[in-house]
């Protein structure tokens, strides 16, 4: 018989940090990643929370993530540049890149920072909200592996390519918008898989485009 265990967000964050450190991540990267995942779960975005831990641990074990990346920023203009992530942990890499973007925007009034050589970066909302909390308007976009089927198609071709936006509000929490360009984010399917639940008919297609045969198939 399964036993339901209830954890506080702080406890969950600490457990994830310990697991990431045990997998080989340095303290700083593990702490930032665990914080990111815990906030995702705390805000109801379970598709990008603790459910991702096994995937990350597997990627680390297979050498798919650089444990101690040599991060660098290449400035291409007064308020633009490329942040090189050296294939480090996505949440850690992108958080460092956002720090630079915020600094440049405060200096110049506007900024653009591209990030290359990184891994799965979690929720885009996490980064744009940081900028909004610094009284800045932010837009973040990210490509992904091809998972989306074009209209009328039967094969994956486009990425989910998430887009996020945030803006500050006086005396209130920032406005934050975060979406995938597909019917649902891939993480929602992972979440359903972890819970052994079927997915709605219109979330995915098979090679025949049969909606009736899709239910739960990808889970």
Predicted regions and their residues:
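A generic, well-ordered mixed alpha/beta core segment in the N-terminal half of proteins
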Residues: 82-170
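N-terminal and secondary-structure boundary signal
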Residues: 21-24, 39-46
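Short, well-structured alpha-helical segments
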Residues: 27-38
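Active-site cofactor/substrate anionic-group-binding motifs, chiefly glycine-
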Residues: 48-102
């Amino acid at each position: 018989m399964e036993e339901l265990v209830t954890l506080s967000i702080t406890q969950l964050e600490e457990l994830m940090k310990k697991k990431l450190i045990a997998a080989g991540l340095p303290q700083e990267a593990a702490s930032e990643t665990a914080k990111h995942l815990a906030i995702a779960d705390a805000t109801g975005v379970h598709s990008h929370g603790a459910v991702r831990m096994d995937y990350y641990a597997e990627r680390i074990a297979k050498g798919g993530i650089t444990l101690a990346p040599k991060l660098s920023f290449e400035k291409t203009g007064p308020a633009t540049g490329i942040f090189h992530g050296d294939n480090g942990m996505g949440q850690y890499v992108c958080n460092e890149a956002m720090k630079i973007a915020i600094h440049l925007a405060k200096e110049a009034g506007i900024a653009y920072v591209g990030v290359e050589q990184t891994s799965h970066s979690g929720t885009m909302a996490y980064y744009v909200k940081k900028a909004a909390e610094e009284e800045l308007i932010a837009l973040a976009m990210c490509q992904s592996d091809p998972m989306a089927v074009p209209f009328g198609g039967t094969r994956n071709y486009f990425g989910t390519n998430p887009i996020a936006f945030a803006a500050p509000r006086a005396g209130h929490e920032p406005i934050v918008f975060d979406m995938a360009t597909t019917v649902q984010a891939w993480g929602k399917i992972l979440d359903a898989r972890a819970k052994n639940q079927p997915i709605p008919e219109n979330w995915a297609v098979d090679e025949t485009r049969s909606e009736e045969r899709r239910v739960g198939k990808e889970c």
